[in-house]
């Protein structure tokens, strides 16, 4: 897997798509200027937050991707052991009724 780190990018998702070939790719940025959320909504990076996008291809037999956002949210929540983390569809991480990631 190729991993790229940037101090600042326009959009991690667009960059991941443009750099993706056949090998999985992870784009991580300290600051994202023009992030997009679900349904094209603007996504703003909080200070001291990371923005990341992961791109990979699926085999034809495994193209049902409906659970992937929830699986990703679960995996990230399992890394956060200090507090109880709740998941909200599709991949939001909620602590003390506040979104901490997604």
Residue ranges and their predicted role:
Residues 1-79, 83, 100-101:
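N-terminal lobe of the biotin/lipoate ligase/transferase fold
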Residues 83-97:
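Catalytic palm active-site di-aspartate
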